[in-house]
Amino acid sequence: MPAASLTSVRSFVAAPVPTRPAISVEGRRAFAFKGVEKRFGDKIVLDGIDLDVPAGQFVAVIGKSGCGKSTLLRLLAGLDRPTSGSLTLGAEEEGHSRTRFMFQEPRLLPWASVVKNVEIGLTGIAAGQDARQRALDILGEVGLADRADEWPSVLSGGQKQRVALARALVGHPQILALDEPLGALDALTRIEMQQLLERIWLAQKFTAVLVTHDVAEAVTLADRVVVISAGRIALDLEVPVARPRRRGSAELARLEGTILDRLFG
């Protein structure tokens, strides 16, 4: 990565995080699950999920492998349908995409430039001739404006995930669904991406739903942590810690302990 680009990214993520109350959301609803069940054949993956999320909230969903976390996210993103129960979404806002999904793998098109990959996120939105400029603007927000016309193959893993994040955000989604998007990154890159994600969330005020196995990541980023066990919500915990948050603080460690006790107790 060129030195200038690396410097710009690091200066961006290192800037102070804006102060925000621990829980600060608008009165609008982002979505609500009511009695949602999802079966695959005879297997019950989600069993009576009730979850009401206000617009603008950052929710982390955590649990052991196979507990139903990713299935919940797929239902929210419209990639699957519940077997029973209801999922209600808030009113769609003009000029905003409804929900965008970010996966653990960047899933970039190797034959398209970085900026063209980002423009794909405008599919279904009337961007017209502004598409390239909108893509360039969001690439600037993730620190990759100078890589816009390069091929994905020359980017590092962390840079590819920044492109994937830009693609998800270019349409100004109301809800961003994140399925362990940082799981494959090294520790330092992961922290930088966490800071970047938090900064953009604070600026754009979308609703974020992050599926993760990392309890520390959950309490660092989220307003609220939902623990799923055997397809049911075992814990729904607010994170009453004002931002900016100090990693490793006693407050966050205590919350981590509560979550781990529920996961393994």
UniProtKB/Swiss-Prot annotation:
Q: Which residues bind ATP?
A: G63, K64, S65, G66, C67, G68, K69, S70
Residue limits of the ABC transporter domain? 31-255
Q: Which GO terms describe its molecular function?
A: ATP binding; ATP hydrolysis activity
Tagged with keyword Transport: yes
What is the protein name given in its UniProt record?
Answer: Aliphatic sulfonates import ATP-binding protein SsuB 1
User: Which EC number(s) does the record attach to this protein?
Assistant: 7.6.2.14
Cytoplasm recorded as keyword: no
Gene3D superfamilies the UniProt entry points to: P-loop containing nucleotide triphosphate hydrolases
Compartments annotated for it: namely: Cell inner membrane
The record's keywords, sorted A to Z, are: ATP-binding, Cell inner membrane, Cell membrane, Membrane, Nucleotide-binding, Translocase, Transport
**Family (UniProt):** Belongs to the ABC transporter superfamily. Aliphatic sulfonates importer (TC 3.A.1.17.2) family.
Known partners and oligomeric status: The complex is composed of two ATP-binding proteins (SsuB), two transmembrane proteins (SsuC) and a solute-binding protein (SsuA).
What's the encoding gene here? ssuB1
Please, which domain of life does this record's source organism belong to?
Bacteria
Q: How does it sit in the membrane?
A: Peripheral membrane protein
Q: What does this protein do?
A: Part of the ABC transporter complex SsuABC involved in aliphatic sulfonates import. Responsible for energy coupling to the transport system.
Organism of this sequence? Mesorhizobium japonicum (strain LMG 29417 / CECT 9101 / MAFF 303099) (Mesorhizobium loti (strain MAFF 303099))
Signal sequence, start to end: none
Q: GO terms for CC?
A: plasma membrane
Q: Name one Pfam family in it.
A: ABC_tran
Question: Catalytic activity, per the record?
Answer: ATP + H2O + aliphatic sulfonate-[sulfonate-binding protein]Side 1 = ADP + phosphate + aliphatic sulfonateSide 2 + [sulfonate-binding protein]Side 1
